[in-house]
């Protein structure tokens, strides 16, 4: 081996050594527990305010929301994680009653350029796709009482990230 090659490798070996000696605890596999929190909502004569959080573990912090029929709903979706929307995007899509969630989510896969929102009439309202640290607020009203399903349409998320909005 050429002695000059040995000298060129010294900085590389030194850098590898320093990186490997970093004094950080070993990363452990994560675990999580789904906790049902009481829905934080504020009702006034004019509107119901709902704050829904999503995170890098592909979870909404609430799976059950409620509001009154005919009353304005102001919903804010927060992505409390750190991963960008290209890899861990989240949105809130409120489906019309009796829409098949699986069929809707599979169709949504074909609409990447539209933030995974199909160009059909199977949903009532949606937020934009959010990356870590982003938020979006939407305002809407539902006249008909019933139970409406909401989902995140980012690929692979809808099976875990869904819940129900009960309109009384």
Segments predicted by a language model, with ranges:
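Short, Lys/Arg-enriched N-terminal segments with co-localized hydrophobic residues
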Residues: 1-4
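Sec-dependent signal peptide recognition
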Residues: 6-13
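C-terminal motif of bacterial Sec signal peptides marking the signal peptidase cleavage site
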Residues: 18-20
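Bacterial signal peptide processing site
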Residues: 22-24
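Extracellular/periplasmic metallocenter environments
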Residues: 27-37, 78, 122-168
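N-terminal edge beta-strand
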Residues: 43-72
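Beta-strand cores of secreted/periplasmic/IMS beta-sandwich domains, seen most often
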Residues: 63-87, 93-94, 136-144, 149, ...
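The feature marks short-to-medium sequence segments in extracytoplasmic or secretory-pathway proteins
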Residues: 90-120
């Amino acid at each position: 081996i050429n002695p000059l090659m040995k000298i060129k490798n010294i900085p590389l070996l030194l850098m590898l050594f320093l990186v490997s000696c970093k004094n950080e605890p070993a990363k452990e596999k994560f675990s999580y527990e789904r906790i049902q929190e009481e829905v934080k909502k504020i009702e006034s004569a004019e509107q119901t305010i709902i704050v829904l959080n999503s995170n890098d573990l592909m979870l909404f912090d609430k799976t059950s929301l409620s509001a009154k029929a005919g009353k304005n709903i102001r919903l804010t979706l927060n992505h409390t994680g750190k991963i960008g929307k290209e890899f861990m995007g989240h949105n809130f899509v409120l489906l019309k009653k009796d829409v098949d969630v699986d069929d809707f989510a599979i169709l949504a896969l074909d609409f990447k350029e539209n933030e995974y929102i199909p160009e059909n009439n199977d949903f009532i309202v949606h937020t934009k796709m959010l990356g870590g640290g982003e938020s979006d607020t939407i305002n809407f009203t539902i006249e008909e009482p019933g139970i409406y399903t909401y989902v995140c349409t980012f690929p692979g998320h809808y099976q875990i990230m869904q819940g129900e909005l009960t309109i009384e």
